[in-house]
Amino acid sequence: MVSHLKKTRKLRGHVSHGHGRVGKHRKGGCRGGRGKAGGMHHHRILMEKWHPGYYGKLGMRTFHLKKNPLHCPVVNIDKLWSLVSDATRQKYAEDKKKVPVIDVTKAGFFKVLGKGRLPNQPVVVKAKYFSKTAERRIVAVGGACVLTA
């Protein structure tokens, strides 16, 4: 017999609604718990298969270690122009009124040392530290040394 009512309408008034007797189809017991329940226990195999490394610790927390206070990456003046593109260098070589600014701290260096030679082109160099020879050679080509924090 065809009926226009859905099954849920027919089951109104019947306690179990077609899902058996006591405790069936209710709450989280019929599906192994709710949410992330049992990840260390009855769902462990699935957790290890699909989410490896979810549980447990890895590595050490080093509260007692301090970062090296003497860490000071250096660059020599003969490598200064390698931090600037060739097009920029040509642009400033043609226009004598403007001077390029090279910030070595953006390239990851803290100190500028004086090994090598600079081309005879003025340049402004920004760094945390300068050696005496580096400062002397930069000023000799008409440049300037700017200290940054």
Curated annotation (Swiss-Prot):
One of its GO terms (cellular component) is cytosolic large ribosomal subunit. It holds the Pfam family Ribosomal_L27A. Residues 1-38 are annotated as: Disordered. Keywords: Ribonucleoprotein, Ribosomal protein. The keyword Ribosomal protein applies. GO terms for biological process: translation. GO terms for molecular function: structural constituent of ribosome. The keyword Nucleotide-binding does not apply. Residues 1-29 have a biased composition (Basic residues). It comes from the Eukaryota. Belongs to the universal ribosomal protein uL15 family. This is Large ribosomal subunit protein uL15. It comes from Tetrahymena thermophila. The gene is RPL27A.
